[in-house]
Amino acid sequence: MLATRNRLRTSADFSTTVRSGVRNGRRNVVLYTAAIAAGEPSRIGFIVSKSVGNAVVRNLVKRRLREAGAASLREHGTGLAIVVRALPASASASWDQLREDYDAALESTLNRLAGRPQRAAAKGSAGTTQKGTPRA
């Protein structure tokens, strides 16, 4: 089980990560990864919908993905928010396939995240219009 400090728990946390993060999909999973404050512990959340299968299958997939996530948290302990969405194909995937897809998607999102320019802090754009011209 993941520690509370390493779990995404609120809808707002999930939404922020999915909207502002980078996405990478594989056959069995889609990963969304976003940078958070460097000193904060990395957090991970899982989305396993009913399209994956019945409750037994969903929980099996969730347990496997949680273990893969725990291993990645040992490597990347701070500064990341990760949302893992299981696709219907994950129901029939083996542990090795799930782990391989998870690791490949995480590596890809981390590479894309590293190449992405850091967003500047809000500078208070109240003085300009959308086109950048000064307001009257």
Curated annotation (Swiss-Prot):
GO terms for biological process: tRNA 5'-leader removal. InterPro entries: Ribosomal_Su5_D2-typ_SF (IPR020568), Ribsml_uS5_D2-typ_fold_subgr (IPR014721), RNase_P (IPR000100), RNase_P_CS (IPR020539). PANTHER family: RIBONUCLEASE P PROTEIN COMPONENT. Its EC number is 3.1.26.5. Consists of a catalytic RNA component (M1 or rnpB) and a protein subunit. It comes from Pseudarthrobacter chlorophenolicus (strain ATCC 700700 / DSM 12829 / CIP 107037 / JCM 12360 / KCTC 9906 / NCIMB 13794 / A6) (Arthrobacter chlorophenolicus). Residues 116-136 are annotated as: Disordered. Residues 126-136 have a biased composition (Polar residues). GO terms for cellular component: ribonuclease P complex. Keywords: Endonuclease, Hydrolase, Nuclease, RNA-binding, tRNA processing. It comes from the Bacteria. GO terms for molecular function: 3'-tRNA processing endoribonuclease activity; ribonuclease P activity; tRNA binding. Disulfide bonds: none annotated. Belongs to the RnpA family. Pfam families: Ribonuclease_P. The keyword Transcription does not apply. It catalyses: Endonucleolytic cleavage of RNA, removing 5'-extranucleotides from tRNA precursor. Coiled coil: none annotated. This is Ribonuclease P protein component. Transmembrane segments: none annotated. The gene is rnpA. RNaseP catalyzes the removal of the 5'-leader sequence from pre-tRNA to produce the mature 5'-terminus. It can also cleave other RNA substrates such as 4.5S RNA. The protein component plays an auxiliary but essential role in vivo by binding to the 5'-leader sequence and broadening the substrate specificity of the ribozyme.
